[in-house]
Amino acid sequence: MSKGTLFDKVWDLHTVRILPSGQTQLFIGLHLIHEVTSPQAFAMLRERNLKVLFPDRTVATVDHIVPTENQARPFIDDLAEEMMRAIETNAKDNNIRFYNIGSGNQGIVHVIAPEQGLTQPGMTIACGDSHTSTHGAFGAIAFGIGTSQVRDVLATQTLALSKLKVRKIEVNGKLSPGVYAKDVILHIIRKLGVKGGVGYAYEYAGTTFESMSMEERMTVCNMSIEGGARCGYINPDGVTFEYLKGRDFSPQGEDWDKAVDWWKSIRSDEDAQYDDVVVFEAADIEPTVTWGITPGQGIGVSEAVPTPESLAESDRYIAKEAYEYMKLIPGSPIKGTKIDVCFIGSCTNGRISDLREAAKFAQGRQVATGVKAFVVPGSERVKQQAEAEGLDKIFVEAGFEWREAGCSMCLAMNPDKLQGDQISASSSNRNFKGRQGSSTGRTLLMSPAMVVAAAVNGKVADVREFI
C-alpha cells in the first residue's frame, strides 16, 4: 500500500470513520454541482425532508445543456429549460452560490472553480461529473460521483469510498514545439490503456509536469478518468501558489502565508511509497490523434492507423469495432484524414491559454472550404479575457465561429452536435460512439493547436509544419 503520498495525507485528514463495510466515510471540502446530475439528488432530499447540510461548501453553475448561440429564455429545448429552472430553484431554496448565464462567472464547472480560486491544494472535491479529476492539478483529491452520491454529499457532506492505490506516473524532459499537455495525457492513456488505472489514483510527477502551467496541468488531470483512474493529481508547488494568489476565494494576507506553508506540507514525501511507478520520456511524445472509439486508441500524427496484427490480442476486438465505426483503413496514415467539423473548447481545453495557443496558429490563415469550425470559451471570464486580448477577432477573421461559454460539442446535451457521419477534430476528452450528437458521427481527439491545423487544411495535419 502507498504511504506518505499526497493522496494518503489528504485522505487521512478527511477520514471521518471506517464504515462496517470497510469503506471510508470521507468528508468533502467542496461540492460542485450542475444542472444535469443535481435535480434528482435534490428531489431525493425533498422526499426525506432533508436540507443541504453545508450550503457554503456547495457551488452551482450551468454548463452541459447551455446553448452557445441563442441563449434566450425559455430555451427551445424543453428538457434543457426544465433543468435550468430546477437548478435555479434548488440553489435559491438551499442558499447555494449559483453562477447563472450572464453573471460573468458562469461556465464549465471544472473551469470556473479553479479560475476563481475555489479549488485549492489539500481539498477533497466531488462533483456529479466524470472529469472532476481536473481539480487534482492543484494537489486536491477530486472525484466524479453519481447522482445518489450527489444526494449523499448534499445531505451529509461525506462519501463512502474505498481507498485507492497510488500509481506514480513520471514524465521527464522538455516537450518539443507543437507538443502539448493534451498529447502527453493521450500518450499515457495509449500506453497504459483505458482500464489501466482502475483502482488507482494517478500521481503525475517528473520534470515535464513541473514545467507545465496550471492550465496545462488541468488538461492532464482532466483526462485521468479516461485512463481508468478515479482521480489524478500533481503535487502543489510554486506554479500552483502563483496561480492561486489573489484569486476571489484564495486566502489573503497572513492566511495566505499559513495556507502556503500547509500546502507545502501535504506534498508527497521524498521517500513516499507507491503501489506502482511508470516512467515516460517527453522526447517520445509527438502530436497525438485518436483514431478509434476510446481515448486509448491514439497514435502520433506521423503514424498509421494500427493493423490488427500490430495490436495485443486483447485489443483486437475493440479495434475491429473501431475500424468499422470510424471507417478508417488499418495501415492508412491518420494524417490527411478528411475533417468536417472542428471544435475548440471543453473542460479539457477551453481555458485562456488554450485559446491563445490556438489563435497563434489561426492568425493569418483561413478555415478550409466546407469545414465548420467554432471556438467555445470554457467560461464567461475566459470569453471576456479572450475578447480583451482580441482573440475573438483572430478566430472570426480566420473563419471560426465565436460562441458563448458552455460544454458545447463535447457531448450531445445541447444544440452543438455532429450531423450524420460527419467527422470532427475536437479538443474535448471523449471519442465514444455518438458522443458528439450523431449515432454515426466520428470524433478525433487532439490538442487545440492541432484542431486549428485540421481546420485550415480540411484534414488531419501536423501543427509542427505551421511552426
Swiss-Prot record:
It holds the Pfam family Aconitase. The keyword 4Fe-4S applies. Its EC number is 4.2.1.33. CDD domains: IPMI. InterPro entries: 3-IsopropMal_deHydase_lsu (IPR004430), Acnase/IPM_dHydase_lsu_aba_1/3 (IPR015931), Acoase/IPM_deHydtase_lsu_aba (IPR001030), Aconitase_4Fe-4S_BS (IPR018136), Aconitase_4Fe-4S_dom (IPR036008), IPM_dehydratase_rel_enz (IPR050067), IPMI_cat (IPR033941). [4Fe-4S] cluster binds at residues 347, 407, 410. It catalyses: (2R,3S)-3-isopropylmalate = (2S)-2-isopropylmalate. It comes from the Bacteria. Transmembrane segments: none annotated. Keywords: 4Fe-4S, Amino-acid biosynthesis, Branched-chain amino acid biosynthesis, Iron, Iron-sulfur, Leucine biosynthesis, Lyase, Metal-binding. Belongs to the aconitase/IPM isomerase family. LeuC type 1 subfamily. PANTHER family: 3-ISOPROPYLMALATE DEHYDRATASE, HOMOACONITASE, MITOCHONDRIAL-RELATED. Heterodimer of LeuC and LeuD. Catalyzes the isomerization between 2-isopropylmalate and 3-isopropylmalate, via the formation of 2-isopropylmaleate. This is 3-isopropylmalate dehydratase large subunit.
